């Protein structure tokens, strides 16, 4: 069996509304409601489903906890503009720019945290990198 792509991931969070506000304001993600009032963050062809800690739907991750996520987002926006945007949103840059390796090759990344402490890497693929 071969997997083609990721459809969604799940983040367990303390406050779904605060998480929705952060990701929509900082990353321009669309907040959607589905199912029985569930919330998700839609971007590109994938989404992040949100579970409130202590109220997770079954089945759930074995050790779901706020702040346990580590996600890399790819953007075509130059990292300096991303850094400026993070600053204007009041989001601290933890590290970077730093060269890393993405799924398709070399990337340059910065790192921030969301309101629950999840590590968010924001990256550009490097063109013609050696």
Describe the role of every protein-language-model region.
Residues 119-122:
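Short glycine-/small-residue motifs
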Residues 1-6, 30-77, 81-113, 125-130:
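Vicinal oxygen chelate
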Residues 19-24, 86, 117:
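Conserved active-site tyrosine of GNAT-family acetyltransferases
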